């Protein structure tokens, strides 16, 4: 490794990451970054999840205020890895305890998250993101440090350059391929992608019914 690459890697690893929410996505990211040598730490509401993560060697806590205060002291990139319905409460806690920290999230919709962040006065330090990865399982037991390998990680445009750089950095460290777009385009594309399997299944069902027994008009009404 040449000196420039080495110094860049050392700079990246030296930047702390605080992951709020240790389900499949947040927990997998914590495991991946910890294995890569990042000073990564996390929080989860569930005591059992905290215990499991700690038993696996992770730096975790069940005290959200203390975790966010630590993030503020260390200028950690805060990754909000909670469901959309829980996001507003988390954002309000970040505004109270770590308002200057760079901020991102991994929620699958971006326009609504941006609105919540703007209402809390945190837009200047926020860059949304969405790793296009997952499984049918959930919880700490389902976490996998290889979950993001070769997956697309979408990073939103329009944010501060320094925050964008840190979000891109963790995406690359997770093994993902970074794609940039704006929140509106992202949400439109994700909506289309999510509907494709249903549309294909419906088309195949209609074709099968029409070919085998006729009655295409009836099939289309179902």
Residue ranges and their predicted role:
Residues 18-19, 80, 155:
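Hydrophobic Val/Ile/Leu positions in short beta-strands of Rossmann-like dinucleotide-binding domains
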Residues 38, 58, 99, 175-177:
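Short phosphate-binding/catalytic loops that engage adenosine nucleotides
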Residues 45-46, 107, 159:
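Residues in the short beta-alpha loop(s) of Rossmann-like NAD(P)-binding domains
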Residues 67-102:
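Rossmann-like NAD(P)-binding element
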Residues 90-141:
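Rossmann-like NAD(P)(H) cofactor-binding subdomain of soluble oxidoreductases
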């Amino acid at each position: 490794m040449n000196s420039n690459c080495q110094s860049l890697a050392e700079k990246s690893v030296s930047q702390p990451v605080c992951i709020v929410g240790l389900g499949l996505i947040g927990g997998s990211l914590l495991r991946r970054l910890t294995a890569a040598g990042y000073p990564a730490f996390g929080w989860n509401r569930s005591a059992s999840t905290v215990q499991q993560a700690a038993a696996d060697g992770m730096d975790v806590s069940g005290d959200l205020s203390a975790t966010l205060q630590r993030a503020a002291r260390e200028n950690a990139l805060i990754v909000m890895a909670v469901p959309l319905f829980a996001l507003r409460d988390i954002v309000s806690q970040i505004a109270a305890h770590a308002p200057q920290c760079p901020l991102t999230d991994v929620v699958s919709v971006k326009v609504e998250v941006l609105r919540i962040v703007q209402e809390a006065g945190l837009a200047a330090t926020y860059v949304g993101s969405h790793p296009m990865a997952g499984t049918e399982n959930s919880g700490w037991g389902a976490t996998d440090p290889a979950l993001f390998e070769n997956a697309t990680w979408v990073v939103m445009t329009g944010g501060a350059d320094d925050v964008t750089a840190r979000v891109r950095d963790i995406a690359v460290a997770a093994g993902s391929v970074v794609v940039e777009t704006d929140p509106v385009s992202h949400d439109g594309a994700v909506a289309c992608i999510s509907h494709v399997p249903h549309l294909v299944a419906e088309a195949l069902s209609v074709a099968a019914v029409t070919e085998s027994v006729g009655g295409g008009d009836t099939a289309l009404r179902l």
